[in-house]
Amino acid sequence: MQLYSIASGSSGNCIYLGEEDGGILIDAGISRKRIVTGLERKGLSLDDIKAIFITHEHSDHISGLGPVLRKNPIPVYATADTVSAIWEKTNMNNISPELFHSIRPEEEIEAGEMLVRPFSISHDAVDPVCYTVEKQGKRAAVATDMGCFDDTIIRVLGQCDSVLIEANHDINMLQVGPYPYSLKMRILGNKGHLSNTSC
């Protein structure tokens, strides 16, 4: 199973998991054009995507979702509160609500030959999750936007063959950097983002 970061960071997030013949996306927080270009680099297209799994409703994780779904009616999976927040925050005109499927943490979802399982995380969103993906006895995890971790997350990640985990700041650089104090505290908090050191 390939794990390929099409984009990561505050400007947008989109991860591909699968094989040469298709797979899934985790998040669609960049333009449709950038997603298409990223997939083309791997010899893939949006027609090869079996499902899109959303971690949470922040714009850097969903901004490309509407444009993708208008041209490619791909099933979308997210927690019920996240689905509601997506519909409230983004332009979903001309998109069928039937594409959206509400899921619960620890629920197992089949996407082609892959088993996808969400797990709860701590972040400042309505009901954020990350995902493990299993295929042919191999398990990978995508763990982004976590403010902290606990024994459950350590156990989940410890059962994986590979893990893509986000750590997005050096504490000292953040503290002396140009961000407003409130943003610094948000990033450093338990519902923010892991630092390079804590990761």
Question: PLM features: what roles do these ranges have?
Answer:
Residues 151-199:
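Cap/insert and terminal regions of metallo-dependent hydrolase folds
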Residues 26-29, 50-57, 76-80, 141-144, ...:
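Active-site neighborhood of phospho(di)ester-bond hydrolases with catalytic His/Asp-centered motifs
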Residues 80-130, 134-137:
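Metallo-beta-lactamase
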Residues 142-154:
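Active-site glycine- and acidic-residue-rich loops that bind
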Residues 33-78:
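Active-site metal-binding motif and surrounding structural segment of the metallo-beta-lactamase
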Residues 1-42, 129-145:
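Conserved beta-strand hairpin/beta-sheet module of binuclear metal-dependent hydrolase folds
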Residues 48, 111, 158-159:
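Alpha-helix C-terminal capping/helix-to-coil transition sites in glycosyltransferase folds
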